[in-house]
């Protein structure tokens, strides 16, 4: 479907693996055109593909504009559930809140990478463009994001005010310029998070403190518009050998050998993330009671911690590829401070892990919020009922959770190829974008 490239999310690895000459040639090529053109692409075929979105049936009529809820989207650093790949036993329940939120959808999104690549996940979450067509880049560092279609531009088109925040340096992945290029009305970084609460010797602000500081920013947004706020957390970033063992609040009973200490510190971080979710939900519940503002929240992990491959049990999957999919499956939830009436539309009846590609999370969130949907978003939602995950490894996941290679099922191939056609029409250098595919339906 497309040619392979060598440049990964860590550019140093390319030079180490393939040598200076190959790395430099690849980098030069990517600077000229970082997006791979699908085989047999043409603009007319892309427009025709968008018509498949006509098959999508919304679970309910969209809300009227005055009833649009505030939208909160959180990318949670290294948020992962080791129950997916190992028989984890511990002295306490690690995610009692997240896995049992009332009035919510719970499942797993598939991260582009195992154990790293936050910006790749961030880009897929915000734009619903898959890294399949650009597997060798860090998006914010390579792509021109001005006038790019994203959930930011989409919600601004519906009248939303927009804000993005991250309690760490603004230079990571060029977020300071990338977020402004995407159109966020305001951005906040480390100096705006004044609580500066950390966990032991770890240098990263806790999720609890991050949410408290961010709530102040949220309340300062315009009151006369619906609000969209995007938050990238930092608390659970590696490494996981920074604290003295006496500070661990979770202790794994399972023997992980050399990774015992890392696992305890990591799980302690996840336990704290889970507790902070309850604090955030309590805050928005109180806000609804106080102001009547409706808020819907989606949160997903960006990737598993880097050591996941060292402790994963191969017997948890039938094939190596399915094990890698599990290692890339990060938890997500969608919750609201008002009744969600159509959670069944976002819940798989055949995959107990309720998995979807990261590019499908935002369309699913907007669906649950009752907002008008573009043809692009509708295509992804309809595609989710056929092949919920497509990967850069030339395979995809079926609705029952099993995987297959491209070419094995022509009907599923058509969905995947159609999606890549639409994506290239959106961002490809040799495509003439049909903006009507990506704008809200009239």
Q: Language model features by range: what are they?
A:
Residues 45-69, 73-76, 81-442:
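Solvent-exposed soluble domains appended to multi-pass membrane proteins
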Residues 11-66:
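Helix-hairpin-helix/helix-loop-helix acidic hairpins
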Residues 6-10:
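Long, acidic (Asp/Glu-rich), low-complexity accessory segments flanking structured domains
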Residues 1-5:
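Conserved small/polar residues in nucleotide/adenosyl-binding loops
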């Amino acid at each position: 479907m497309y040619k392979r490239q060598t440049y990964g999310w860590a550019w140093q690895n390319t030079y180490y693996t393939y040598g200076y000459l190959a790395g430099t040639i690849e980098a030069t090529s990517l600077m000229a055109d970082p997006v791979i053109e699908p085989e047999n692409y043409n603009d007319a075929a892309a427009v025709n593909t968008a018509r498949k979105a006509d098959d999508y049936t919304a679970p309910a009529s969209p809300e009227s504009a005055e009833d649009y809820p505030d939208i909160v989207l959180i990318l949670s650093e290294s948020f992962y559930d080791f129950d997916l790949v190992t028989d984890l036993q511990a002295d306490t329940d690690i995610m009692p809140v997240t896995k049992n939120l009332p009035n919510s959808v719970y499942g797993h999104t598939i991260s582009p990478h195992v154990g790293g690549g936050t910006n790749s996940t961030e880009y897929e979450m915000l734009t619903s463009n898959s890294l399949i067509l650009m597997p060798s880049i860090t998006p914010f560092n390579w792509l021109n994001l001005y006038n790019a279609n994203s959930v930011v531009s989409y919600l601004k088109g519906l009248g939303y005010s927009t804000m993005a925040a991250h309690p760490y340096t603004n230079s990571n992945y060029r977020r300071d310029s990338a977020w402004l290029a995407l159109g966020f009305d305001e951005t906040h970084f480390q100096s705006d998070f004044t609580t500066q609460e950390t966990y032991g010797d770890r240098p990263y602000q806790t999720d609890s403190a991050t949410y408290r500081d961010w709530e102040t920013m949220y309340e300062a947004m315009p009151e006369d518009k619906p609000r969209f706020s995007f938050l990238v957390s930092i608390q659970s970033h590696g490494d996981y050998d920074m604290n003295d063992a006496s500070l661990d609040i979770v202790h794994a009973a399972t023997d992980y050998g050399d990774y015992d200490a890392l696992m305890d510190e990591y799980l302690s971080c996840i336990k704290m993330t889970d507790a902070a979710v309850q604090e955030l939900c309590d805050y928005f519940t109180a806000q609804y009671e106080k102001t009547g503002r409706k808020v819907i929240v989606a949160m997903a992990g960006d990737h598993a911690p880097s050591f996941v491959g060292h402790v994963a049990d191969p017997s948890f999957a039938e094939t190596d590829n399915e094990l890698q999919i599990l290692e890339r499956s990060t938890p997500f939830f969608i919750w609201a401070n008002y009744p969600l009436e159509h959670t069944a539309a976002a819940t798989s009846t055949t995959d107990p892990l309720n998995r979807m590609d990261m590019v499908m999370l935002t369309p699913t969130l907007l669906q649950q919020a009752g907002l008008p949907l573009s043809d692009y978003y509708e295509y992804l939602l309809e595609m989710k009922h056929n092949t919920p995950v497509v990967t850069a490894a030339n395979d995809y996941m079926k609705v029952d959770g099993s995987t297959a290679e491209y070419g094995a099922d022509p009907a599923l191939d058509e969905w995947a190829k159609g999606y890549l056609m639409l994506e290239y029409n959106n961002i490809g250098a040799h495509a003439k974008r049909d903006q009507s595919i990506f704008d809200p339906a009239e």
